Amino acid sequence: MEFVDEKRYRKIKNGVGRAVADFNLIEEGDRIAVAVSGGKDSYTLLHILEALRRRAPVKYDLVAFTIDSGYPGFRSDVIAAHLKEHGFSHHVEATTHYDIIKEKRRPGSSYCSICARLKRGVLYTLAQQHGCNKLALGHHLDDFVETLLLNQFFVGTLKAMAPRMLADNGATTVIRPLVYVEEREIIPFARENSFPVVCCCCPVCGKADIQRKRMKELLKELERENPAVKRSLLRALANVQPRHLLDRELQRVCEVP
């Protein structure tokens, strides 16, 4: 695919390439399942990974997966048409997640968390069924720092996301190659390259996750004083000083001569 803005494309590609090198995200012979929801982030991830694949010093394969959660009006056909046009291997998995969520969701709670858990489980299964050893997700830099703040403010844990981690099933390695890419770089990239963004059609889409929206607002406020605040928060995740934290287990480890 020829990208409209070469400078923006290279900036995003270089960010992904740096993450791949820093965290050893892609290795020789990998078969990578890429979760494609129809959103700007997952389209960007898939196209950039393909662009890197064509010139990478290691050989790897990509397989795109879309989970249809059963929300009325979800246009998986639009996603399928775009990926077919660009030669991607693609599989759509239909589920009854919407019915499960309606039954299990607590009154007043968000659809997002339970929906994400259900999708992730299906993606792990699909990855194994299709011989994929890795699963690539489209979380970008903003997602990392927002999650860090959410966990600190509302959960009381010092925790964000990992760019690379072994899934609970013990068989699939989850990778997040967009860790160094900001959302404000992805938005125009997706728009100018006419990625056919598809709404998830969740009944409360745009209304849920008020806490995450508040974190976005807070970061915007902080950026007025320090434009590099998000990247500073991301650097903090790679610059942990255990001796200066309150975790007792870490304190014991640090005291061992």
UniProtKB/Swiss-Prot annotation:
<dbReference type="InterPro" id="IPR012089">
    <property type="entry name" value="tRNA_Cyd_32_2_STrfase"/>
</dbReference>
<dbReference type="Pfam" id="PF01171">
    <property type="entry name" value="ATP_bind_3"/>
</dbReference>
<keyword id="KW-0820">tRNA-binding</keyword>
<keyword id="KW-0411">Iron-sulfur</keyword>
<keyword id="KW-0694">RNA-binding</keyword>
<comment type="subunit">
    <text>Homodimer.</text>
</comment>
<keyword id="KW-0808">Transferase</keyword>
<keyword id="KW-0479">Metal-binding</keyword>
<keyword id="KW-0547">Nucleotide-binding</keyword>
<keyword id="KW-0819">tRNA processing</keyword>
<dbReference type="GO" id="GO:0016740">
    <property type="term" value="F:transferase activity"/>
</dbReference>
<keyword id="KW-0067">ATP-binding</keyword>
<feature type="binding site">
    <location>
        <position position="202"/>
    </location>
    <ligand>
        <name>[4Fe-4S] cluster</name>
    </ligand>
</feature>
<keyword id="KW-0408">Iron</keyword>
<comment type="similarity">
    <text>Belongs to the TtcA family.</text>
</comment>
<dbReference type="InterPro" id="IPR035107">
    <property type="entry name" value="tRNA_thiolation_TtcA_Ctu1"/>
</dbReference>
<feature type="binding site">
    <location>
        <position position="115"/>
    </location>
    <ligand>
        <name>[4Fe-4S] cluster</name>
    </ligand>
</feature>
<dbReference type="GO" id="GO:0005737">
    <property type="term" value="C:cytoplasm"/>
</dbReference>
<comment type="function">
    <text>Catalyzes the ATP-dependent 2-thiolation of cytidine in position 32 of tRNA, to form 2-thiocytidine (s(2)C32). The sulfur atoms are provided by the cysteine/cysteine desulfurase (IscS) system.</text>
</comment>
<keyword id="KW-0004">4Fe-4S</keyword>
<comment type="pathway">
    <text>tRNA modification.</text>
</comment>
<feature type="binding site">
    <location>
        <position position="112"/>
    </location>
    <ligand>
        <name>[4Fe-4S] cluster</name>
    </ligand>
</feature>
<keyword id="KW-0963">Cytoplasm</keyword>
<protein>
    <recommendedName>
        <fullName>tRNA-cytidine(32) 2-sulfurtransferase</fullName>
        <ecNumber>2.8.1.-</ecNumber>
    </recommendedName>
</protein>
<dbReference type="InterPro" id="IPR014729">
    <property type="entry name" value="Rossmann-like_a/b/a_fold"/>
</dbReference>
<dbReference type="GO" id="GO:0000049">
    <property type="term" value="F:tRNA binding"/>
</dbReference>
<keyword id="KW-0460">Magnesium</keyword>
<dbReference type="GO" id="GO:0051539">
    <property type="term" value="F:4 iron, 4 sulfur cluster binding"/>
</dbReference>
<dbReference type="GO" id="GO:0006400">
    <property type="term" value="P:tRNA modification"/>
</dbReference>
<dbReference type="InterPro" id="IPR011063">
    <property type="entry name" value="TilS/TtcA_N"/>
</dbReference>
<dbReference type="GO" id="GO:0046872">
    <property type="term" value="F:metal ion binding"/>
</dbReference>
<feature type="short sequence motif" description="PP-loop motif">
    <location>
        <begin position="37"/>
        <end position="42"/>
    </location>
</feature>
<dbReference type="GO" id="GO:0005524">
    <property type="term" value="F:ATP binding"/>
</dbReference>
